[in-house]
Amino acid sequence: MKNKKEVYGFRKSKVAKTLCGAVLGTALIAFADKAVFADEVTETTSTSTVEVATTGNPATNLPEAQGEMSQVAKESQAKAGSKESALPVEVSSADLDKAVADAKSAGVKVVQDETKDKGTATTATDNAQKQDEIKSDYAKQAEEIKTTTEAYKKEVAAHQAETDKINAENKAADDKYQKDLKSHQEEVEKINTANATAKAEYEAKLAQYQKDLATVKKANEDSQQDYQNKLSAYQTELARVQKANAEAKEAYEKAVKENTAKNEALKVENEAIKQRNETAKATYEAAMKQYEADLAAIKKANEDNDADYQAKLAAYQTELARVQKANAEAKEAYDKAVKENTAKNTAIQAENEAIKQRNETAKATYDAAVKKYEADLAAVKQANATNEADYQAKLAAYQTELARVQKANADAKATYEKAVEDNKAKNAAIKAENEEIKQRNAVAKTDYEAKLAKYEADLAKYKKEFAAYTAALAEAESKKKQDGYLSEPRSQSLNFKSEPNAIRTIDSSVHQYGQQELDALVKSWGISPTNPDRKKSRAYSYFNAINSNNTYAKLVLEKDKPVDVTYTGLKNSSFNGKKISKVVYTYTLKETGFNDGTKMTMFASSDPTVTAWYNDYFTSTNINVKVKFYDEEGQLMNLTGGLVNFSSLNRGNGSGAIDKDAIESVRNFNGRYIPISGSSIKIHENNSAYADSSNAEKSLGARWNTSEWDTTSSPNNWYGAIVGEITQSEISFNMASSKSGNIWFAFNSNINAIGVPTKPVAPTAPTQPMYETEKPLEPAPVAPSYENEPTPPVKTPDQPEPSKPEEPTYETEKPLEPAPVAPSYENEPTPPVKTPDQPEPSKPEEPNYETEKPLEPAPVAPSYENEPTPPVKIPDQPEPSKPEEPTYDPLPTPPLAPTPKQLPTPPVVPTVHFHYSSLLAQPQINKEIKNEDGVDIDRTLVAKQSIVKFELKTEALTAGRPKTTSFVLVDPLPTGYKFDLDATKAASTGFDTTYDEASHTVTFKATDETLATYNADLTKPVETLHPTVVGRVLNDGATYTNNFTLTVNDAYGIKSNVVRVTTPGKPNDPDNPNNNYIKPTKVNKNKEGLNIDGKEVLAGSTNYYELTWDLDQYKGDKSSKEAIQNGFYYVDDYPEEALDVRPDLVKVADEKGNQVSGVSVQQYDSLEAAPKKVQDLLKKANITVKGAFQLFSADNPEEFYKQYVATGTSLVITDPMTVKSEFGKTGGKYENKAYQIDFGNGYATEVVVNNVPKITPKKDVTVSLDPTSENLDGQTVQLYQTFNYRLIGGLIPQNHSEELEDYSFVDDYDQAGDQYTGNYKTFSSLNLTMKDGSVIKAGTDLTSQTTAETDATNGIVTVRFKEDFLQKISLDSPFQAETYLQMRRIAIGTFENTYVNTVNKVAYASNTVRTTTPIPRTPDKPTPIPTPKPKDPDKPETPKEPKVPSPKVEDPSAPIPVSVGKELTTLPKTGTNDATYMPYLGLAALVGFLGLGLAKRKED
């Protein structure tokens, strides 16, 4: 098999990164690839954003989906277990060879039979056994050949002696025979003469005979002609008669045929009639049979139906009895619970009364102690005040003297301190300056010494390097004609090898394409994967491989329009030691054979040393490239003398599917070429360089195949290269290609030629610094002498105040037991319905049968003519007699030659056969996959980010093997496996380990020491070392399959078994049925368990968040202990601004509802408030919490893993949270999101969103029940006027989450100015939809659905909706109501009023209304309204519907005015049948109608 490099969509990268050709793919590792294990690749770092596909899993960290398996891995695994060739095993045959040689020398016929194939030994034991068999066989063959050879030698000697004796006797007999033979020859000549005369006479007679014979033949021919004439006439008449007879016969036969046809048709028709009759009869009989069967089945079905109905009826009656009994028992239990509850609450009330008495006694004791404390405290304060006055007088005198002394001392001190500060300032400045001088001197000295040391080290290094450089140049000169050396030795002064962090800029006038945009443009050119033209579809695959790499700038070059690509921020490049900071490439398309020749795609790399890709779409392309370098000052640099490498210039290495004769070349180089001795690249006209013929295949004349020279590590990579010497500031050359598809060229200073030294740059010696001199300090000032300060007075201590008594802790009364919940009764079962009987089928009718038709009679036969008599032929004349040839005299009998005596039969040459035996060995290999603990994880699951190790094992090499010259293992790693090169090297001693990033392939080559171990004793088996690949699996829901290839001595290759491991998160995984997306869920539910995601949630409601910890896909997981110790967590990032957590209600259960232990929950106010361990945990999982959060954690990760993770048991966390009451006053949306963290990997739930409605109750003042009437807020209400407080409740929006349990109006009115009349009305503010589907229209009177509580003493009215009514309202319906409280103004002044609307126990305050009542001009005597009799507050009163006459209905838009101070005699109806509001007409009418007594006025 030839080494073939397939061009397939990804260009190999070279460490040299030099200008190179169009081969795109990494060479596939195959058995025949011998020592070529991977194409040359370099790792590059890109800062560009790359779009990646994700798994669909809600992962927070590592969300990328596993990429497609590399082509190398795909083909390797497709051939898993396959073997190519084997290693020969040699067994000595020396004795056999000597026996064969001796036999040949003795004349024995030696036949070498076909070599006996002993097969392939796959183990050392098998090999040893087969070698023993071969050795035994060789010994046996040698012995048999020796025996045969010796026997044959003896037989040959005896035969030779007998042969010599017989030869002498035979010679004497032969001499006598020669004499007799001469006499015989003389007699023969005499007889021959007589016979010649007799022959002449015979020939004359023969001539006469032939003449007579001709005459007779002529007569016979004339007779024959006459006969033929008569025969012709006969045949004519015969033909006429035969024709007439034939026509008569034909007419007869036609009549017979027609008769037969008619009769056959009649027979067919009769047969059809017979068949139809039979079919009709059979159909009838079958129908009758079916009828009878259907009739029986229907009867049977009707019987079964009746039996089934009876059975269901019996079961219904049984179930009905059970349900009725169960409901009766439930009612009995409920009644018992109510009785017990009443008894408990009676006891609690008695105990609460005792507590109240104890609290009152404790309060009385406390009040007495407080009174005594206050008297004692007053006496102490008086004594302390006298003491304080005396102390203050003494203190004043002291402070006056102290002030004088302190001022004098302060003045002196200030003068001195100023002098000191001035002195300090001056000296500080001098010291600072001196310190700076000292520092500058020290820095200068240190800098100088460092530079001097560096200079000396650099100088020594330079001298050493210069000596090596000189020697290298001399060596290059001496070897310039040898393969791989420059034909003109040069040194390299340019360092331009790698700039991964360069900043690439392209002028904004040049359009940079996006991936999809460029893809669409190229497809519009006909380059498409669906194009039936294979050349164009193949060209698209090449283009797409480059276009999918987003680190390149995607450009379209237009003919003769230059495009500049500038790179700045260069860090690693220099020329003759001078730094290069910028490089500018100018690309100009000169020509192309593609389409109209005006455009071509190009891709500019982010690294200027990697440079660019361009396309030719299997046509031709020529691009001019100009290069300019700039120094740190921005000046153009002249790099004359620098060397650049033009390498990997392939020819004949194109796509076999299109045209292999692809050519890559450099043209119009404005520098000077320096050929490499032995290179295939030659200089041509126009200063171009390329190969004259194929340099890809030996069979086409190349010195090596491509795979033997076109790799980074190949010592022959100079074979496809030439070196360019720069001769001017602007470098210019053309990159040209033909039929290459994609071409990558890299412009840099890596040189493929051997022995090109880098010229060292001599260091510059540093200049010794000039040191500064330090300045002297100023002298210090003299300190002053100070006056002593006076002694301060001593204050007598105050008397301590008496201890204040502590207020006692009062006992809290116990709450009453809640009433028992009424039972929910089972519905009685539905009685069964009997299925109607099936009707009987219709009976079939017997058919009418057809009659058959008679046949036609046969026709009469014709009479024929007789045929004529044929003519008689006359016999021929007889021919004359032929003369007889004479009898000649016989020749005499010659003498008998003597019969020589038979020589003795020579001994039969024996034939000996021998054969050799062939034996091959195939060392077997095995791939194992393990976790970090060394546990086999093949065909199992492990967590994402787990360390996974691949062990590449080879069994012992067998005895008798050839010398091992190479032992190479190649492992194309699975996509998404993060390879750890350092750890792999550490785990793979005995091997040189290399990694090809482009193909994601690791190669292990046995070191020389390892090979020496293998070859120490070839006669014995030897155990092999095995390398281990170490890395991590990075993707969710990924399957990692892997095998490797072993190649020994470039001859034997074997591909291992395929191992597989899967990470959780893969739906429809055929290998792991439990595997699916790792998808934690979060659902908000109410207390009934209904999903309330997205619904309106009232303040004070409890959200029962249900968090699913999704673990089922981990079933069978075999993650390592290290992965398990990363822990298992669940994070709830709740909105603390809206919710309060309820840790007392948190529950954790498994899928079956069993409570789970070993999971703790911790709440943190913020990420910053959490421990660093928690912060690191969330950071690693890439989880960002917004504020407060809860963290659920497994206390013991290992136990948690065993019990739940490895068993695939998902958990359900119920995490209740209550909506803060204050949030209802502002309203708004709140969001909640949670995260699951397994093995350190995070997965997010969906965001749960709810909204809290803003409850905004409103209060108006009206004189009627008309909602459109004027609001008197801020206006005047007359004394004794009757009016209404309109209490408009908050709006509960539709689609709310919780049933309404409480909706109340609490009006704490000012009883000093207002008097509640005891009358109120409550109406629906909007349409209400009930659970049963009925609708209550807006404006409907709902007073009967409320209860009212009145506290006249404190001026409080509470109107509350009945709970059973509220719970009938559908959750999908909005709700709002308003209540009118009828009031009477009973005092003069301004009065303010606010009411509270409570919704599910949360209070919301309304606006405040203000009304003013002036002093009336002519006040009437008021008629007091009796205060309603206080009711039991525990038994709120339900207002009764008043019975009123039916007065004329007034227009509600024009309310009837109320007379001030005068009572009305009637109260109009407050509503019509359609629930339209009606105005109240006045207090007196209301009093008269309701029959209310006078109430005691509240006092101010």
Swiss-Prot record:
Residues 790-800, 829-839, 868-878, 889-906 have a biased composition (Pro residues). Residues 164-470 are annotated as: 4 X approximate tandem repeats, HR1. Its main location: secreted. The keyword Cell wall biogenesis/degradation does not apply. This is Agglutinin receptor. Ag I/II A repeats lie at residues 146-220, 221-302, 303-384, 385-466. Residues 801-816, 840-855, 1429-1451 have a biased composition (Basic and acidic residues).
